[in-house]
Amino acid sequence: MPAKGTAEWKGGLQTGTGTFTAGDSIGGGFTFKSRFEDGPGSNPEQLIAAAHAACFSMALSAALERAGTPVESVQTDATVTLRLVDGAPVITNIALVTQGRVPGIDEATFVKEAEGAKANCPVSKALAGVPEITLEASLL
């Protein structure tokens, strides 16, 4: 099933404004300040973070279920770091921090399955050009 997102930018880079939609229920506005100066509003990197956290959580849950250890819950926080490199904005790091409630599994197995999910979720694969993607995984 194709997924669709739409964005429109009006005006110059530093003074303009943008809007985006994704699916039926996600939408917002963004500006230069919300993207590069931690100002109010959304930015594309937040959407990447949410997409990565969601995809990773589902991939980890599926892997654990296939291994015979159904999940009560998996929560993942993703932090996308955007920095200027040689004067151009570059996503330099994505940090995934995941916690799971998985009865009947030990920490080492959970971490192993989390590493597999990080390598194999479709969004991780799409972000393969990011220089560093880190993972912290623990059981609750």
Language-model regions, residue ranges each:
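Extended beta-strand/beta-hairpin segments
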Residues: 1-50, 57-140
